[in-house]
Design a protein with these regions (language model features):
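N-terminal anchoring/stem segment of glycosyltransferases
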Residues: 1-61, 74-78, 252-268
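Amphipathic alpha-helical segments that form well-ordered structural scaffolds
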Residues: 18, 22-25, 68, 187-197
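Short beta-alpha junction loops
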Residues: 37-41, 87, 111-113
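Glycine-rich, basic loop-to-helix element that forms the pyrophosphate-binding segment
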Residues: 61-69
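Short beta-strand-to-loop acidic/aromatic patch adjacent to the donor-nucleotide binding site
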Residues: 77-86
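Conserved donor-nucleotide/metal-binding helix-loop-beta segment in metal-dependent transferases, i.e.
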Residues: 89-129
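PAPS-dependent sulfotransferase catalytic domain
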Residues: 115, 119-152, 188-189
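A glycosyltransferase accessory/donor-loop signature
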Residues: 137-149, 157-268
Length: 268
């Protein structure tokens, strides 16, 4: 049995429903889904879904990630997968090469290795934000490995200490009050910097595709020979190897989702 952890606020519960439909498409039957509904009562009715109403505070719900993972360790201590709500799994997901036993979660690498965001003030001056401020704050001089995305990771009881430290950053009122200065990409920034701080070099590599488009989903599902390709020449839709695409991240556009779900239903 695999144990899945997900969370959302009330606006994104529909994505959890879509994810469950993708599990059926991938023929994943032996699972439990620990679903944390942030500040509301879920209306999902599924015997495989364990619904947990989690209290809401002023943070973005991304920052609840490590604490709900820690809470799930009270239910089960092995074979755990965390997924963001905007993910659909591939038909290949049953073959995902999950590994456990390390003292840290295992993530997938990002196609964008130096992401940044920015603000522009009233005079048109741009200020960029990335992981550098948090690295400097923690005395981390360099990366130990490539940048990873926090949309997915595997973990077990051995990761508890890492998750506790990760949680401490995601609940740190001082750091949170500084906004993008320290956390350019919400919980993902401290996840990366903590991995580098510990000198960790292990990850899954690139095992997914970022996309909101049905056409990208379909072409990757139906072909195993797409290698090192920017789909539609889009830098954000990088496909390293379609035979090892196990899920799709960023599936948020309603019209495109409806096409994907129709395809899933027709091929389940």
């Amino acid at each position: 049995m695999i144990n899945i952890v997900m969370l959302s606020d009330s606006n994104y519960e529909y994505q959890i429903r879509n994810f469950i439909r993708s599990l059926e498409y991938a023929k994943i039957q032996d699972y439990r889904l620990f679903y944390y509904s942030i500040g509301f009562d879920s209306t999902i009715d599924n015997p495989k879904v364990i619904k947990i109403n989690w209290p809401k505070d002023g943070r973005r719900f991304d920052f609840y990630k490590p604490e709900v993972c820690l809470n799930t360790l009270n239910y089960t201590k092995e074979n755990l997968y965390f997924f963001d709500a905007d993910i659909l799994v591939s038909k290949r997901f049953s073959r995902f090469p999950a590994r456990y036993g390390s003292s840290y979660p295992l993530f997938c690498t990002s196609g964008v290795q130096h992401p940044y965001t920015f603000t522009i003030d009233g005079n048109g001056n741009q200020t960029d934000f990335n992981e550098k401020n948090l690295m400097n704050y923690l005395g981390v001089s360099e990366r130990s490995m490539d940048y990873v995305l926090a949309c997915f990771f595997t973990f077990d009881e051995n990761c508890r200490d890492f998750l506790e430290e990760y949680k401490s950053f995601c609940k740190n009122e001082y750091m949170l009050s500084k906004g993008m200065h320290y956390y350019a990409f919400t919980d993902e920034t401290p996840a990366n910097v903590l991995l580098w701080k510990k000198g960790i070099r292990d990850n899954y590599g690139r095992k997914f595709v970022n996309t909101h488009k049905f056409s990208t989903f379909k072409v990757c599902e139906e072909n195993n020979n797409i290698k090192k390709t920017l789909i539609d020449d889009n830098f954000y839709e990088q496909c390293e190897d379609s035979s090892e695409v196990y899920f799709y991240h960023g599936t948020k556009v309603k019209e495109e989702n409806e096409k994907i779900l129709k395809y899933i239903d027709e091929n389940s």
